[in-house]
Amino acid sequence: MKKIPLKFTALSLSLLLSSIASAEELSAKQSLDKMTQALDNLNYEIAFVQTTPANMDSFRYRHIKQDNKTYAQLVTLDGRQQEIIQRDNLVSYFQPNAQAFTLNSGNIVDAMPAVVRANFDKLSSDYDFVKLGKDRVAGRFADTIRIVPKDDFRYQYLVFIDEENGLLLRSDMLDREGKLLDQFRVVTLYIDDRLRGLTDYINKVSLPPLLKESKNEQSSDITWSAGWLPQGFSLIRYTQEILENEIIDSALYSDGLFTFTLFVSNVGSNDLPENTWKQGAYTIYSEVIGGKEITFIGQLPISTAKRIVQEVKFR
C-alpha cells in the first residue's frame, strides 16, 4: 500500500482544522450579542480607563449575579473616591460634598460606553457591523469589530471583544474622519476569583433616599416637535420644569447607541447669536427661532445638531 507523505498529511490536517475554526468563528453580529450577554451574566472585575480629548479617568467595576439578583460597584481610582453601587434594581450614588441618593435602575450606566448595552437587532437597520480581525487588549485576544452608520449624521464605534468570554475590552468612538472622540479601555480583568464578599458588602450598605423621577409629560402637553431626526432616532422622554419662574421643556432622543436632548425655553429677543461648543463626542448648539431658544446637547456631529435644531416645529 502506497504511503501518503507526512508533509501532505500535516497539510491536510492543517486545512481541516482551519476550516473547522472558520466554521465556529462568530459573525460580527454574534460577537456583539455575546458582549451584551456577558456584561450582565458573568461575574467579573475590571479596571479601566476612560479617555476624552480633555480628560482621562480610571475606574474599577465589579459585577456579580447571585440568587437571580445583580450586584455591582463602580469606584473612581483617581482623586477623591466616588462610589456607585447596585443592589438589583436600585442604584445608589455616593460622592464627596454631595447628598447621597438612590435611583430605580437595572444597571450602572456611568462611565460605561453605551455600546455595551445596545440592541444590535434594532441597530442593524441603521448600522453595518464589520469584523476586522484579531487584536490584543490587556493581554487578552480580542475580536475587532467596526460599527458603521449607514448615513453621515452620526459617529461610529470600533470595539474589541474578549474572544474567550465576550466582555468588552476596548471601545473607540470615532468621528467620520476616524478621529478619536472617546475611548474605554480595560487594563486588568478578573473572572470570579476576586469577587468574594462583594454581595455581603453591598447588602450591608445603608441605601440613601430614593429620588422621585421627573414627571414624563403626556404627548398632548408638547407644543413643539422635532421636524427631522436621523433614521432610527425616537423620543424617549419629555419633561417640563420651572427654573427661576421660567418653563423649560426638555426631550430626550436616542437611536439605541447615541443620545441627545433638546431644551426649549422662551427668550426676550430674537437677536441672540447662535452658539456652538464641542468637546470630544459632545456637541452643544443653540439658536433662537420664533422667540424660543432651542438648545441641543448630545453625541452627534455639529452639522446634524444644527439641522435638528433648525427643523424644530411649533404648534
Swiss-Prot record:
Gene3D superfamilies: Lipoprotein localisation LolA/LolB/LppX, MucB/RseB, C-terminal domain. Keywords: Lipid-binding, Periplasm, Signal, Transcription, Transcription regulation. Residues 1-23 form the signal peptide. Binding to RseA is inhibited by LPS fragments; phosphorylated N-acetylglucosamine (GlcNAc) with N-linked acyl chains are minimally necessary to disrupt binding to RseA. Once RseB is no longer bound to RseA the latter is susceptible to DegS degradation. Thus if periplasmic LPS levels increase the sigma-E regulon is induced. InterPro entries: MucB/RseB_C (IPR033436), MucB/RseB_C_sf (IPR038484), MucB/RseB_N (IPR033434), MucB_RseB (IPR005588). Its main location: periplasm. CDD domains: RseB. Transmembrane segments: none annotated. Negatively modulates the activity of sigma-E (RpoE) by stabilizing RseA under non-stress conditions. Although not essential for association of sigma-E with Rsea it increases their affinity 2- to 3-fold. When bound to RseA it prevents proteolysis by DegS, which is probably relieved by lipopolysaccharide binding (LPS). This is Sigma-E factor regulatory protein RseB. It comes from Haemophilus influenzae (strain ATCC 51907 / DSM 11121 / KW20 / Rd). The gene is rseB.
